[in-house]
Amino acid sequence: ESGGSGEANGMWFGPRL
């Protein structure tokens, strides 16, 4: 998943998993 730093995904609030 493309998270990053608090992405709009609402799940990944860190590294790009």
From Swiss-Prot:
InterPro entries: Pyrokinin_CS. Signal peptide: none annotated. GO terms for biological process: neuropeptide signaling pathway. Its main location: secreted. The keyword Secreted applies. Keywords: Amidation, Neuropeptide, Secreted. GO terms for molecular function: neuropeptide hormone activity. The modification Leucine amide is found at L17. It comes from the Eukaryota. PROSITE patterns: PYROKININ (PS00539). It is found in: Secreted. GO terms for cellular component: extracellular region. Transmembrane segments: none annotated. Belongs to the pyrokinin family. Myoactive. This is Pyrokinin-5. It comes from Blattella germanica (German cockroach).
